[in-house]
Amino acid sequence: MEPFDHGWLDVGQGHRVYYEQCGNPQGKPALYLHGGPGSGCSPRQRRFFDPTVWRAVLFDQRGCGRSTPLGDTAHNHSDALIADIEALRRHLGIERWLVFGGSWGATLAATYAARNRDACSGVLLRGLFLGGRTDIDGFFHGAAALAPEAHEAFMQAIPARWRNRVVVWLDRVFSSGDSARIDRAVLAWRAWEHALGVWPERTVPADPTADEWPLLRARYRVQSHYLAHRCFIGEAKVMDAIARLHGLPVAFVHGTNDLICRPQNAWRAHRTLAGSRLAWAQGAGHDPFHPASLKLLGSALAAHARDGHFDAWPGEPS
């Protein structure tokens, strides 16, 4: 599916965000929010949407992907991203849209929807990340017992005195301007992500190509910036935002084997939010394109497109 429209929106403070619209120009509006933070959107993510049904909007958050300046962390925080989403909605003339995000994108989707309920027809959250210290520390250390060799290799790239404050060290490295240190950190972080299943299409990381290097440096610079500041939201505010979604159609999809975002995140959020639905992607990790995850996401989108809610979707009611 190719975009029928794309462009860059000037959101102020020196930032221009890339956006694209795919599918049916007269279809039901939906916004997809990518994860990371820092990852940017990819053509694969268009596959979530039935092109005959949805007018799907994807955009690269500040500093990510095709947005400019690439990798810029100035004026780059969660409140700015939420304002950008609203600016994009108004720019595109959309009254209400389904907001769909995965991982960090789910964090952002929930927070945006809580502040802009009237702009949302529903919320679909996949692999929920809560943005607190438990999640962040868990990402760097929680899976060490399951991938001990990969974790040891990752820790060897980090000075011993920083191994209990990995994200602070990474933020300093990516802000240092020292290209050699930055590139070593890119390779170490990327290898650890591969071990946890963030990059499912390749079991062993190939060396980055010349085209990939700038995007990887930007990705991890933005990600370290956000994680060092607990994504400028923190777990308590994310859970409060989820509680304030009461009355909106909300569905959660989470992989039972997710090593990046703990399954209990989805369970806690679901139990907090009366009327929400939760479905477990059996055997899936963090990869949204695992067959079990992809099937559930597709059925959730189809249910919302048909009914305007998730009540008849297979997920468990809260």
Model-found features: residue ranges?
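N-terminal cap/lid segment of alpha/beta-hydrolase-fold proteins
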Residues: 1-16, 223
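Short beta-strand/loop motif that positions the catalytic acidic residue
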Residues: 245-246, 252-254
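Conserved HGGG/HGGXW glycine-rich cap/lid loop of the alpha/beta-hydrolase fold
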Residues: 11-69
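Conserved acidic catalytic loop of the alpha/beta-hydrolase fold
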Residues: 79-97
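Catalytic active-site module of serine/aspartate enzymes centered on a nucleophile-bearing elbow/loop
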Residues: 277-318
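Conserved hydrolase catalytic core segment
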Residues: 95-134
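A catalytic-pocket lid/entrance helix-loop region that shapes and gates access to the active site
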Residues: 120-169
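Conserved alpha/beta-hydrolase "acid-adjacent" motif
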Residues: 259-265
